[in-house]
Design a protein with these regions (language model features):
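Short helix-initiation/N-cap motifs at beta->coil->alpha
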Residues: 3, 81-95
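Extracytoplasmic/periplasmic solute-binding protein
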Residues: 3-52, 98
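Glycine-centered hinge/linker elements that transmit conformational signals in sensory
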Residues: 5-11, 49-83
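Paired acidic/hydrophobic, glycine-rich loop segments that form the ligand-binding mouth/hinge
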Residues: 20, 99-104, 122
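Beta->alpha turn/N-cap motifs
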Residues: 26, 86, 103-108, 141-142
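Short, solvent-exposed loop/beta-turn-alpha elements that line the ligand-binding surface or hinge
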Residues: 39-65, 113-115, 128-136, 189-195
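Extracytoplasmic/periplasmic substrate-recognition and gating elements
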Residues: 75-76, 113-180
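Long, aromatic- and glycine/proline-rich binding clefts that accommodate carbohydrate-like moieties
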Residues: 124-126, 175-205
Length: 205
């Protein structure tokens, strides 16, 4: 985020945007900003060493770093308050009002449809808070769960449905329609996947 200040004026004066960045207030974004710093969201190693019992971002300065950079961008006029939710900043971007927005891959198809060729949509990796950060993002969004209800017939039927959902064909279609990553790299060999990448190269990011 700290690098946005360096290009803010250029985007507004030369790029024609009235906002530099439309960034919604959304919990998943906060989680990723913590992860990009390489810091833990919760104690006990993010719950990997033992059961997490409390958040850690208020002690390891992760939250402070996020809010400090965000407040700076807001005070400089580069990141106005656009509302709560993961889609809060998308409308301004799709309308050409803001130069940059933030979203997961699951937002990409909707953005491309909303922009509808009015301007070129570029994609990039999830931003860091500081240039020196060396962390990464965590998974989020749709997950597939099967519960053990002790009924053998239902469990067999559930497993058949799960196999259908995680098949390369289904995952290629799922990726093309939503932007979510396919859970199997075999989906990359499906024509649906290849056609989508050819039409929308932004999905490669």
């Amino acid at each position: 985020l700290e690098g946005i200040s360096k290009i803010g004026d250029q985007l507004m004066n030369q790029g024609g945007a009235s906002e530099v960045m439309s960034l919604g207030i959304y919990g998943w974004f906060f989680e990723q900003f913590v992860g990009k710093q390489g810091l833990d969201y919760a104690n006990n190693g993010n719950g990997r060493d033992d059961v997490a019992t409390a958040v850690d971002f208020d002690k390891n300065e992760a939250a402070k770093n996020i809010l400090t950079e965000w407040q700076t961008l807001n005070q400089e006029g580069y990141a106005p308050i656009v509302g709560k939710g993961g889609d809060a900043g998308l409308a301004d971007f799709s309308a050409g009002k803001s130069a940059i927005t933030l979203g997961s891959t699951a937002s990409l198809k909707q953005i491309l449809q909303d922009v509808n060729g009015k301007f070129e949509v570029g994609t990039a990796y999830f931003p860091k808070i500081k240039e020196s950060d060396e962390g990464g993002v965590s998974i989020g969004g749709a997950s597939l769960w099967a519960l053990n209800n002790q009924d053998p017939k239902k469990l067999r039927a559930t497993w058949e449905f799960v196999k259908f959902l995680i098949s390369p064909e289904s995952q290629a279609y799922w990726n093309a329609q939503t932007g979510y990553f396919p859970v199997t790299t075999a989906a990359h060999e499906e024509q649906t996947f290849k056609d989508n990448i050819a039409q929308y190269p932004q999905f490669q990011t």
